[in-house]
Amino acid sequence: MPATGVPQSYYAKYAAYLAERSFTALTFDYRGIGRSRNGDLRTSNARMRDWALLDAAAAWRFLGERPKLVVVGHSFGGQALGLLPEPSHIAAALLVGSQSGYWRNWPPLGRLWMWPATHIGLPAVAKLLGYFPGSRLGFGEDLPRGVALEWASWCRHPRYLVGALGVEDAYAQVHARMRAYAISDDAFAPLRAVEALAELYPRSRWETRRVAPQEIGAAEIGHFGFFRERFRASLWRESADWLEEACES
């Protein structure tokens, strides 16, 4: 499941690698993003919850009944598992840069941009332009107005989307093994925010895998690097090994 504003094409090589490892891999675009963008975003009435309740749910139904269903979620993609049609059927989930977006989960320096971004900047720009110009501001692709506004509102709630939507019971249905990658140079998913997400999946079998670029001989990884092919022999192999082991357990 993709991150906010990131098209499925970004994950194509990682998905192909998983297919080489004998997984059936499906990628998709949320409405308003990538190949699911249809016309002027200013006419879109999409909300962020629709990305999970409608788009991810459609991908889920497309896969049909399978003995082992695993999810790889990047950022928002790992936050939304409790909104899937039957979250109790997830066998395992691998999360990359996924976090609770509540602004206070950031360290002091991070709060200096998270608070104004989520309380003022993002809502104001989305309302003024009728969409959020993420492509011009370095935040992936442009976002529909409703997506940007709902995302900002979740970031102002102490329990993020789970509290804002009142879906605690649905998230308690996630019993899967979950591995969350907390990457030391990821400014969009600091460790505290990653661990706060674990609290939103109270019945999951959660583990946090902390990774520093130096550990794998890299200069940087950041929020988006995990899915780069240069990490095929390190992060990709390790994550696929974990998914295989999780499916067997």
Feature locations, PLM:
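Short beta-strand/loop motif that positions the catalytic acidic residue
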Residues: 174, 180-182
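Conserved alpha/beta-hydrolase
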Residues: 8-40
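Alpha/beta-hydrolase active-site loop
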Residues: 45-64
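Alpha/beta-hydrolase-fold enzymes
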Residues: 72-158
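Catalytic active-site module of serine/aspartate enzymes centered on a nucleophile-bearing elbow/loop
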Residues: 211-249
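Active-site glycine-rich loops that stabilize anionic/oxyanionic intermediates
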Residues: 2-7
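Short alpha-helix in the alpha/beta-hydrolase fold that links the catalytic acid
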Residues: 190-200
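Active-site nucleophile elbow and catalytic-triad environment of alpha/beta-hydrolase enzymes
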Residues: 154-170, 176
